[in-house]
């Protein structure tokens, strides 16, 4: 197979693949064949060379199988570069892909084969005792290495196969020559793994040991010293840990101190005695130390303090312990003697004179408080208790007058009555004492006489309302509510005429109802003439047609409630009592919202069963018929007057 090839001209100004022209001059490229016969003969020669190399590698692998002794080498021992057997090949490296670079590949591979062969010969000389090398100097050098470094001569069979790429097994001869005769005499087989070393020189025994005549008669033959022969090198290692005892003691002391800080102090008797002894010793040493440095402190003080400052900053402490002269001046408390009037005047004059001479600087810190603080006794003033009581009583009376003259501010509830609230619950808000009376707790005192300044004009109830109190089902079934005011006095039993005397002293009560058209205002003023028509209208609304729709329902909201005037505060003129007439005395008001049949039936249970206004029954019916308004429920009675 002949291939034609035409050479391309290459510029000599360029470098070929990083190689300079000097390299090309030293290693010229091979000449191209003129004809095809020369080229074919070269290909045939390369093929024959490859076949010979392959046959040699087969023989070496067969011998390695027979011997069983394997060693490591690389694949480069078999030059498998038959792929590059012509100048048309591209080579192994991708960098040398030019058609002219095949010569450089040949040179590199030839050099690498030579170096690899030299390394293999060195390994065989050192480890396998082979002498097949042709280099005399290399053989002598390897013998010298083997003599100086015996640990390199380790013979044996490799058990673990190599895992690295590029390595293979090859056979070694069964009998390997050894350089020394002593080694050959003891060597039986090379398949065993052992380490060769130098023989130890044994010491000869002394004359007393070898001569049996010198031995004592009582000794046996077993007591003779014997030397055990052994081969190998003996090395002795002496390890000594040098620790300083002082450092160790110091470490223990520091660790003890740390442990003592972390935990509670010891409370054992031994520790307590130890601490007490240490405290006493410290006190003695401290006293001696203070006594030694006392003179130095005084000299230092005298040297730095001026004469002016000595008079001002004079230390005059009184020592509580005269037998102990080693107390520091700063620890001794100064005692101030009692001062008289003459001494006080002298001190004030001296202080005024010395204020201009007080130094400003570090010496001011040494000032003491002697002659600067004056303490005098002040006689106690006895208080007049009778005068204070009178003042308190007068203040209380004034506050009561203010409360009584106020137009019903403490009696009227703040908000509107809630729906679905019973009649007793709606009127119970009037029985609560005012906030000011609940907060303060006045001491018990006697009743004050009625004076002209406290009296008020008395207005009888005949001018306002004439009638009899009507009972309700709640009055018959339930007990009267308890009064929340503490100091209200109960009225005497059987007094019916006294009710009209103090009735004009109470405040006016105004109860606002929900809705603008269903309001009921009941007020008591000194002008009874202006309120008579309004009261007559209230009385007329009571005898209207009964409401039978919500008569027996307990949850019916009461749109109107009592507007009552309490009449209990008989023992205290000038003090308005808060509450409803729960004792059944006098007239407190008339219900505007209850018009049921049960309420009308309650009139028969009164002992005085006459109606106060009998001639106004017919106009009442007419007025109630005109005043009734029809809403959704059809059961709410509203007043036709816009002002109510």
Curated annotation (Swiss-Prot):
Give the GO terms filed under biological process for this record. cilium assembly; protein localization to cilium
Signal peptide as annotated in the record: none
Ranges of compositional bias, category Polar residues = 449-459, 626-644
Q: Where do the record's region annotations for Disordered lie?
A: 392-490, 551-575, 609-644
Instruction: One Pfam family, please name it.
Output: DUF3719
Query: InterPro entries from the xrefs?
Result: DUF3719 (IPR022194), FAM149 (IPR039630)
**Amino acid composition bias (Basic and acidic residues), ranges on this chain:** 395-404
Organism superkingdom = Eukaryota
Family stated for the protein in its record: Belongs to the FAM149 family.
* Stated name of the protein: Protein FAM149B1
Q: What is the species listed in this Swiss-Prot or TrEMBL entry?
A: Danio rerio
Which gene produces this protein? fam149b1
């Amino acid at each position: 197979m002949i291939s034609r090839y035409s050479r391309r001209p290459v510029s000599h100004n360029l470098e070929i693949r990083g190689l300079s022209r000097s390299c090309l001059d030293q290693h010229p490229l091979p000449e191209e064949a003129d004809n095809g016969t020369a080229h074919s003969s070269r290909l045939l020669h390369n093929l024959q060379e490859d076949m010979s190399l392959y046959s040699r590698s087969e023989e070496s692998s067969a011998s390695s199988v027979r011997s069983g002794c394997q060693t490591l080498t690389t694949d480069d021992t078999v030059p498998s570069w038959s792929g590059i057997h012509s100048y048309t090949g591209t080579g192994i490296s991708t960098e040398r892909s030019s058609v002219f670079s095949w010569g450089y590949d040949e040179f590199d591979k030839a050099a690498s084969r030579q170096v690899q062969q030299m390394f293999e010969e060195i390994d065989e000389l050192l480890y396998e005792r082979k002498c097949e090398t042709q280099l005399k100097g290399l053989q002598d050098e390897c013998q010298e290495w083997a003599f100086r470094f015996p640990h390199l001569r380790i013979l044996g069979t490799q058990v673990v196969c190599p895992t690295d790429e590029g390595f293979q097994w090859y056979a070694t001869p069964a009998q390997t020559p050894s350089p020394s005769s002593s080694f050959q005499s003891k060597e039986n087989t090379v398949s065993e793994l052992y380490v060769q070393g130098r023989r130890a020189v044994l010491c000869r025994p002394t004359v007393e040991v070898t001569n049996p005549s010198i031995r004592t008669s009582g000794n046996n033959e077993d007591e003779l010293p014997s030397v055990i022969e052994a081969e190998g090198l003996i090395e002795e290692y002496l390890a000594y840990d040098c620790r300083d005892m002082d450092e160790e003691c110091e470490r223990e002391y520091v660790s003890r101190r740390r442990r003592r800080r972390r935990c509670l102090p010891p409370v054992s008797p031994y520790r307590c005695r130890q601490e007490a002894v240490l405290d006493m010793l410290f006190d003695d040493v401290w006293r001696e130390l203070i006594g030694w440095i006392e003179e130095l402190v005084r000299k230092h003080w005298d040297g730095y303090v001026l004469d002016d400052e000595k008079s001002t900053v004079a230390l005059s402490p009184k020592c509580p312990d005269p037998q102990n002269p080693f107390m520091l001046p700063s620890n001794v408390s100064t005692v101030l003697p009692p001062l008289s009037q003459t001494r006080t005047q002298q001190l004030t004059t001296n202080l005024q004179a010395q204020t201009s001479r007080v130094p400003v600087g570090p010496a001011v810190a040494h000032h003491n408080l002697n002659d600067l603080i004056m303490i005098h006794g002040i006689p106690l003033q006895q208080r007049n208790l009778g005068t204070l009581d009178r003042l308190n009583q007068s203040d209380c009376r004034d506050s009561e007058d203010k409360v009584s003259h106020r137009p019903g501010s403490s009696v009227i509830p703040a908000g509107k009555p809630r729906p679905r609230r019973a009649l007793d619950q709606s009127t119970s808000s009037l029985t609560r004492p005012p906030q000011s009376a609940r907060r303060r707790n006045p001491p018990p005192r006697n009743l004050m006489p009625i004076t002209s300044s406290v009296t008020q004009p008395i207005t009888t109830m005949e001018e306002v309302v004439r009638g009899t109190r009507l009972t309700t089902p709640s009055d018959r079934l339930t007990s009267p509510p308890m009064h929340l005011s503490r100091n209200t006095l109960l009225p005497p039993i059987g007094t019916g005429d006294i009710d009209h005397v103090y009735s004009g002293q109470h405040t006016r009560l105004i109860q606002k109802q929900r809705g603008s058209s269903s309001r009921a205002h009941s007020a008591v003023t000194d002008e009874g003439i202006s309120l008579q028509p309004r009261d007559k209208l209230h009385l007329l609304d009571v005898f209207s047609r009964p409401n039978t729709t919500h008569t027996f329902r307990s949850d019916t909201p009461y749109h109107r409630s009592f507007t009552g005037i309490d009449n209990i505060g008989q023992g205290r003129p000038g003090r308005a009592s808060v509450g409803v007439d729960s004792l059944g005395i006098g007239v407190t008001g008339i219900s505007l919202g209850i018009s049921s049949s049960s309420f009308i039936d309650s009139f028969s249970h009164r002992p005085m069963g006459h109606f106060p206004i009998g001639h106004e029954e017919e106009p009442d019916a007419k007025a109630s018929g005109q005043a009734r308004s029809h809403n959704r429920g059809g059961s709410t009675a509203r007043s036709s007057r816009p002002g109510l």
